[in-house]
Amino acid sequence: MEKPSTLLVHFDKGSAAMAGEIKADLEGSDVAAKVDAMKRAVMLLLNGETLPTLFITVVRYVLPSEDHTIQKLLLLYLEIIDKRDAAGRGLPEMILICQNLRNNLHHPNEYIRGVTLRFLCRLSEPEVLEPLVPSILENLDHRHHFIRRHALSAISSIYRLPHGDQLVPDAPELVERALASEQDASARRNAFLMLCTCAQERAVAYLLSNADRVAEWPDLLQMAAVDLIRKVCRSPNRADKGRYIKIIIALLSSPSTAVVYECAGALVSLSSAPTAVRAAANTYCELLSSQSDNNVKLIVLDRLNELRTSHRDVMVDVVMDVLRALASPNLDVKRKVLDLVLDLLTARNVEEVVLYLKKEVVKTQAGELEKSGEYRQMLVQAIHACAVEYPEVAGSVVHLLMDFLGDTNVAAAVDVVLFVREIIETNPKLRVSMIQRLIDTFYQIRASRVCSCALWILGEYSLSLSEVENAISTIKQCLGDVPFYTVSEEGEATDSAKPAQPVVNSVTVSSRRPVVLADGTYATQSAATEAISTPSVAPGSLSSTLNLRSLILSGDFFLAAVISCTLTKLVLRLEEVQPSMVEVNKACTGALLVMTSILQLGQSSYLPHPIDNDSYDRIVLCVRLLCNTGDDVRKVWLQSCRQSFAKMLAEKQFRETEEMKAKAQISHAQPDDLIDFYHLKSRRGMSQLELEDEVQDDLKAATGGFTKDAYDANRLNRILQLTGFSDPVYAEAYVTVHHYDIVLDVTIINRTKETLQNLCLELATMGDLKLVDRPQNYTLAPESSKQIRANIKVSSTETGVIFGNIVYETSNVMERSVVVLNDIHIDIMDYISPATCADVTFRNMWAEFEWENKVAVNTVIQNEKEFLDHIIKSTNMKCLTPPSALDGECGFLAANLYAKSVFGEDALVNISIEKQFDGKLSGYIRIRSKTQGIALSLGDKITLKQKGGS
C-alpha cells in the first residue's frame, strides 16, 4: 500500500468479491442491508482499499435515503474517500454531493443538520465548501443549540484553511456577534475559541469587557479564558498584565476543580508576587485535601514541589496544610508529602511538624491504618531528619520512637535504633534518659541487626556506675542461664535453660550466603544475622525476655561476637567507676563465662553449623583482653570507637553543608545585565498585587530568574553530521533529549544547482524508540536549506539507534535518489542523573533487583581513586561512599554509585578494585537494576569509557 493506513482489519473474503456484494446491497431497497454494506465499505476504505466504482452507486442509491444511520455512515464514507487526484486537484464528481449536503443543512431534523455541520469541520476542499457557506451561516441563528454549536465549529474550521478568509471573510464579526447573544455553554466556548485562534484581539476585548462576570461563566468557557490569558501574557513587558491576574484570581473561586487547578498554574506563570504565589499554593492545598483520586493528589504535590523550588519562603506558610494530606491511605502520596514537608522545615515550624508526625506515629501503633509498618518506617525517617537538622526537637519524640525497637517491621526498627544512635551522640543532655529507656525496652527487641546496634549504644554510652551495672544485668537476663546447653548422661544435648525440653529440633538452620556490607564489598555470614524476620524456633524455646539467647541458638554468632564486645566494654568501664574490685572481678568472671559458653556452643555438634572464624577470633580477643588489660588497649576500646562515630557524623554534616553551599553559589546572571529600578516607575493606578509583581520581576531579572539556559553555545558541541560534504544533500542534526521524547532538529542543505523535488527525510528506529510524525515531502531550491524537526517517543532507558535516508527527485533523473544517513546513537547518559539514597536502601535494592551486569576492570589507569573518579564522570552517577572511606593507599577500593533515570528507574553500581603487583588495576564493576535495559546500557557505557577514553 502506498498510503499509510489508519486501521487494519482482516477480511476472509477477497476484496473484489466483497466490493460486488456491497454494490448489490446498496442498490437494493433493504435498509438493514444498506447499513451493513456501508459499514463494510467504510472498513475496506480504512483498510487501504480504494473501491473507485462505488462512489457513483453511493450517490445514486444512498444519498437520497432518509434513514439517520445511513446518513451518518454516508458522512463517514465521504470523509475518508479520496477527494483529490494524483496532481492534488479536487475531483469533479465531488460536486455531486454538494446539493445533498446543502439539503441536509436545511433539513427539518436537528440531528441531520448537526452531524452534517460536524462533518464539514473535517473537509478541506474549497470547491465543496464554497457553495455551502451561506447555508452554514444561516444555521448560526437556529433555535437549537446543538446546531448553533456545530455551525460555529464549522465556520472556525473553514476560516483556518489556507484560503479560508476568502471563503468567509467576515467570520470574526459574525462569530463575535453570535457570542454576544449565545446562551449555550458549548456554543459560547466554540465561538470564543474561534476568536482566540483567528482574531485574538476580539477575544481579548470580549474577555476584558466581561472581566467582572468571568466568575459566572460556565467552566468550559472559563478554561478557554485561562488558555487565552496564558497565550496573551507570553509576550514580555505587557502593561496590562495586572488586569489578567485579577481575572485569574477571580476564577480561583470557581466551583470547577479543573478551572481552579489551571488558574493556580497560570497565576504562578504570570506573577512572582508573594500574594499571587500564596493564593496558588493555598489553592493547591485545597485541591489536595478535597480530591480523593490519588493521581490528582500526586499531580498537585508535583506542582507544590515546583513552587517550593522557586518560592520556598511562601511555601513555608502552608506546610501544615500540606501535612493534612497524610490522611490519604496511599503510601506514594504519603511519601511525597513527607519529602515536600522536610524541604520546608524552619526553626519556626519544626515543632509543629514534629508534633503532627508524632500523632501519626501513635495512629500506626493503634493499628488504625493499612500498611502501618511501612508508614511507620517513613514517619521514623522523617522525624529522624527533623531531629538531625533541629536537635532541640529530638527530646520530644525519641522516647516515643524507642517503643518501636521491638517492631515486627524490622526496617522500621532499624531506622529507630539508628535514630537513637545519632541523637544520643549529638544531644548529650538526652543520654541518661535514653540509656535508661533502652535498658527498659531491650528485652522487646527481636531483630538481630537492631540488637547489634542497641548493644553498641549500651557499650559506648553507659557511663555511670548504675548505668553500667544495669546494662550488664539486662544483657545477662536476655542471655539466660549459661552454659547454653548441657550434655546428659545418655549423650543428648539439651538447652540448659530448658532442662526438660529437648531443643535440637528447635534450632533454626542458618544458611550461609554472601551479603553486601556498607562499603559495597561482599562478606559471608549466616542468614540469621540479616534478621529479615523474627527467628523461627520451636514452641517454648523463645521467651519474652530471652531474645539474645534465642538468636544465638539459631546460629547467629555475629550477634554473639557483638555481645562479647559489649560486655568487654562494660567491664572495662566498670573498672573505672566501681571502687570495689570484688564487684569488678565478679562482673569480669560473668562476662568470661558468657564468652566461653558461646565458644563452647559454636564448636559443639549441637548446632548444624559451627561458629565462623571471624566471630571466633573476635570473641577470643575479648577473652584475652579481659584476662590481661593494658592502658593503650583500654583507650582504644573506651574512646576510639565513639570518636570514630562522632567523626563520621561530622563528615556527613560537612558534606551536606558543602552541597548546599555549592547549589547556592550557582550564578544565574551576569554582572553587567540590565536591572530596572521599580522605584523610578510610575505607580499611579497600580494595585498592591501589581506593585508586588513589578518588584518580583525586577528581583528575578537581577538574580537570573528569567535566564534561559536550554539554548546556548554548548548546543554547537553536540551537532551530529549525518552525511558527507561531498554528498549532493548535506544534513546535520542536533538531538534534544526531553524526559519522554527526543527532538531531532535536522538541517538539510541542497549543494546542487538543481531543484530537489519530493525531498523526504525517512527515519527508522531500533530499540524502545518510536517515531511520532509521518515523513513529509518538501521542495528544495538550488543551494538552499531546510529545517526539519522530527519527534521520537522514548519509553525506556535502553540504548536506541536512529537511522534513515534522504530521498529526493530531480528533473534530469527519472528514478529517486537516496542518500544514506549516519546512525544516531541515543546515549543513556541523557536519561540518568545523580541521586542519593541511604545505605540501607541501597542494600535492600541491591538484594531485590534481579538484573546484574558484571564488567571486568580493564584500564590503563593505575590509581584506584583516579579510576573511580573517571567512572563517576563517565556514568554521571553519585558516589554514596564517603570520601573518608576512600582516603589512603591500601591497594584496595570499594565504592557504591547511584543514579535515577527520568522514568524512575534505579541504577546501582558497585566498584571493587585492587592494585596488582605490576601496578595494574583488577576487579569488577557490578551494575544492578530492576530492568534489563538500564543494566545492559550502563554496562556498555562503562566498558567503552573505563579505559580512559573520552
UniProtKB/Swiss-Prot annotation:
State the annotated membrane topology for this chain.
Peripheral membrane protein
What this protein is called in its record is: Coatomer subunit beta-2
Record bears the keyword Signal: no
Q: Does the keyword Metal-binding apply?
A: no
Q: Where in the cell is it found?
A: Cytoplasm; Golgi apparatus membrane; Cytoplasmic vesicle, COPI-coated vesicle membrane
* Quaternary context: Oligomeric complex that consists of at least the alpha, beta, beta', gamma, delta, epsilon and zeta subunits.
* Molecular functions (GO terms): structural molecule activity
PANTHER family associated with the record: COATOMER SUBUNIT BETA
The HEAT repeats are at 92-126, 127-164, 275-312, 313-350, 392-429
Q: Which InterPro entries match?
A: ARM-like (IPR011989), ARM-type_fold (IPR016024), Clathrin/coatomer_adapt-like_N (IPR002553), Coatomer_bsu_C (IPR011710), COPB1 (IPR016460), COPB1_appendage_platform_dom (IPR029446)
Q: Which UniProt keywords apply?
A: Cytoplasm, Cytoplasmic vesicle, ER-Golgi transport, Golgi apparatus, Membrane, Protein transport, Repeat, Transport
